[in-house]
From Swiss-Prot:
One of its GO terms (molecular function) is unfolded protein binding. The gene is htpG. Residues 559-637 are annotated as: C. It comes from Ehrlichia canis (strain Jake). It comes from the Bacteria. Keywords: ATP-binding, Chaperone, Cytoplasm, Nucleotide-binding, Stress response. HAMAP family: HSP90. This is Chaperone protein HtpG.
Length: 637
């Protein structure tokens, strides 16, 4: 350890203290993770210097063999991890180790407080970039000595994790470029100065790190602990399942095994290699707006970035792994990556390949595909909302699977649906809702189910968006059943025999009574509805809401109101079922006695019922309750 001068004691940022406490006490069952995090940080430091040296060769000063060296002092119970990467100066040490300078700190604290599993905590540690502090799980004191590339003065940072740290200048100006971390281990953590224990941890977590990891033995010799080659440079046959598992865990920071592996070497107009994984477990922050892509971009095995590059679209953000291209210049700036034509071509190729593999899996093993769909189906459908050409949208829809009124709990494709369409049926019908159980009970489905017409059941929030963007599939229009009342008139030949018989029994007098009641209902409900009509879709329920063709979907309108993007609530059409006992008696009563207060109350109650079934808020809950009470009083008189 170097002698120091000009020492200054500083306090940790307040949030760091909280993170330290939580990390130390949350990972006590999985302490190995500290070494993985420190090695990962060392690798990042080498990546950064390698990247910076592309535009400034003087930074590496002839030392181009990047490496990470681990050594121990068993007598003093100390563990050392050193690298010859970018290094840090005084301000870097304060910024990187004394504060957490990103907005996700509080989210990390909230998330880790709510996480119960050890593996879940490990995932959080990696995701929020606070892995350095895990060193305090095993160390009573941590000392960081570092000299930044291109600078002559080195600095020391040391702390016991007690809320303070000391920054000093290294007296010896000969400290090598890079960083050396000294862990003064706690007495009970002496296992971490054992060479075999260290080797096991490196093999488990850091075997495929981009730089050689050495162990400095008692003879002063460096023994290599990790792989010679980047795993993605090997052929598919050369990579074992265990190697995939190790690499997947190192890049994904999630538990479980990869659900799908996509390893391809593309040698066409654009040359690149991709090694991508789809996890079998859904990440905790999949839907967080700040979630970034977890696919790293390399150029000839030189790490470039994993931030701010849309090489993987947001709707494939569940992908983990790397893309390595030889068709990008090594000195490409991160800013120019955004509009790079090679990047765009790689993106299109990756999307096409992923969708193709997903479609194959869905066709060959729907039970296994269902696991993927339950984890990531709603994310994949986000792509349907994006601006894309028809070919890509059709491919994306081909990979989608849906529940339907005919499929119980199994999933179907739109191709399956089209093959089963009834004679005279021109549309793919769908209905959106909150969950499968409630949507299957919707009155909107009754007329379709009674005719044997299949309806796609959509239960993800994103479904309300993409169904407003996608109008057809394979030139077959998509149509919400809420707008499809008139369609059922054309499909009357599909009615069940008893329904056909009932239709034939209708006489002109009954039609006049119904028409008169409809006019009365319009008069009573007035501005609360845009119209009242006899439903062609209801068979068991008395009423439902409907919207006219060209009108906004009910659920979509409600979402926009909740997001303050709409400041009005449109009126809906009330559909009535004259064959339902309640409505039938109301029609007869109006025909015999004319309007009265009870009928008035009943109409308002039926409108309220229709609104509730569609998830709409009642305009006046107090009036609804009062009308309900008045009707109940009449019942018991």
């Amino acid at each position: 350890m170097q002698d120091v001068v000009n020492s200054e004691k500083l306090k940790f940022d307040a949030e760091v203290g909280k993170v330290l406490k939580l990390v130390i006490h949350s990972l006590y069952t999985n302490k190995d993770i500290f070494l993985r995090e420190l090695i990962s940080n060392a690798s990042d430091a080498c990546d950064k210097l390698r990247y910076e040296s592309l535009s400034n060769q003087d930074l590496i000063d002839g030392d181009t063999d990047f490496k990470i060296v681990i050594s121990v002092d068993q007598d003093k119970n100390r563990l050392y991890i050193s690298d010859n990467g970018i290094g840090m100066n005084r301000q870097d040490l304060i910024d990187n180790l004394g504060t957490i300078a990103h907005s996700g700190t509080q989210r990390f604290l909230d998330a880790i407080n709510n996480e119960t599993s050890s593996q879940g905590v490990v995932e959080l540690i990696g995701k929020f970039g606070v892995g350095f502090y895990s060193a305090f799980m095993v160390a009573s004191e941590v000392i960081v000595e570092s000299r930044k590339a291109g600078e002559s003065i080195g600095y020391q940072w040391r702390s016991a994790g007690d809320g303070e740290f000391i920054i000093s200048q290294l007296e010896d100006g000969q400290f090598p470029r890079g960083t050396k971390i000294t862990l003064i281990l706690k007495t009970e953590e002496s296992e971490f100065v054992d060479k075999f224990r260290i080797e096991h941890i490196v093999t488990t977590y850091s075997y495929h790190i981009n730089y050689p990891v050495y162990f400095l033995n008692d003879a002063g010799e460096e023994e290599k602990l990790n792989s010679d080659a980047a795993i993605w440079t090997k052929s598919k046959d050369e990579i074992s399942a265990q190697e995939h598992q190790n690499f997947f865990r190192s890049v994904a920071h999630v538990g479980g095994e990869p659900w799908m592996i996509l390893h391809n070497k593309n040698e066409g107009v654009i040359e690149y290699t991709n090694l991508l994984y789809i996890p079998s477990i859904k990440p905790f922050d999949l839907f967080h707006p700040d979630r970034k892509c977890s696919v790293k971009l390399y150029v000839n095995k030189v790490f470039i970035t994993e931030d701010n590059v849309q090489i993987i679209p947001q709707y494939l953000r569940f992908l983990k792994g790397i893309i390595d291209s030889s068709d990008l210049p090594l000195n490409i700036s991160r800013e120019t990556l955004q509009n790079n034509k090679v990047i765009e071509k790689i993106k299109q190729s990756i999307v096409k390949r992923v969708l193709s593999e997903l479609k194959k899996k869905a066709e060959n093993d729907i039970n296994d595909y269902k696991k993927f769909w339950e984890n990531f189906g709603s994310v994949l459908k986000e792509g349907l909302c994006e601006s894309m050409n028809t070919e890509f949208r059709e491919e994306l829809l081909s990979a989608c699977r849906f529940y339907s009124t005919n499929s119980d709990d199994s999933l179907i494709s739109l191709e399956d649906y089209i093959e089963r369409m009834k004679e005279g049926q021109d549309n793919i019908y769908y209905l959106t809702g909150n969950d499968l159980d409630s949507i299957k009970k919707s009155p909107q489905l009754e007329g379709f189910v009674s005719r044997g017409i299949e309806v796609i059941l959509l239960i993800d929030p994103v479904d309300d968006f993409w169904t407003n963007v996608v109008t057809d599939y394979q030139r077959v229009p998509l149509k919400s059943v809420i707008r499809a009342d008139e369609d059922l008139e054309k499909l009357a030949h599909l009615k069940k025999d008893e329904e056909v018989g009932e239709s034939k029994d209708e006489n002109p007098d009954s039609k006049e009574k119904v028409d008169a009641f409809v006019k009365y209902a319009i008069q009573v409900l007035d501005k609360l509805v845009s119209g009242v009509r006899v439903s062609k879709k209801l068979t068991n329920s008395p009423v439902c809401l409907a919207v006219a063709d060209g009108s906004m979907d009910i659920r979509m309108e409600r979402f926009l109101r909740e997001q303050k993007q709409l400041n009005y609530k449109s009126t809906k059409i009330l559909e009535i079922n004259p064959k339902h006992p309640i409505v039938s008696r109301m029609i007869d009563e109006y025909a015999n006695t004319g309007e009265n207060a009870v009928l008035d109350n009943m109409l308002h109650l039926l409108l309220g019922q229709a609104c509730i079934l569609e998830g709409e808020e009642l305009e006046d809950v107090s009036s609804f309750a009062e009308r309900m009470n008045n009707v109940l009083v009449k019942v018991y008189q």
